[in-house]
Design a protein with these regions (language model features):
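Positively charged, small/polar-rich N-terminal and surface patches that mediate targeting and assembly
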Residues: 1-89
């Protein structure tokens, strides 16, 4: 079953995470975004993966996010969604 990973990461981590994922042969779409109470700049990464690839992709995101400095400020938020249908045209 296909999964959609939506990873919202700090904008300064976005390029490093994108590089790591593409080097691991994941197809990734990066979207500039902002959010949260302070409207901080973020990067939203979209990945379509097989179910058995989710853990490895999440691990790459974790490994290539900068260390958390402030307990109230997370470096990444990752959503994993079921994909009912997937097609490329």
């Amino acid at each position: 079953m296909m999964k959609l990973i939506v990873a919202v990461v700090h904008h300064t981590d976005g390029e490093e995470i994108l590089r790591a994922l593409t080097e691991a042969h994941y197809s990734v779409t990066r979207i500039a975004s902002s959010g949260g109470f302070l409207r901080r700049r973020t990067a939203t990464l979209l990945l379509g993966v097989q179910a058995d690839q989710v853990a490895a992709a999440r691990q790459l995101i974790r490994e290539h996010s900068a260390p958390q400095v402030d307990a109230g400020f997370k470096r990444a938020t990752v959503f994993v969604l079921n994909v009912e249908r997937y097609e490329q045209v």
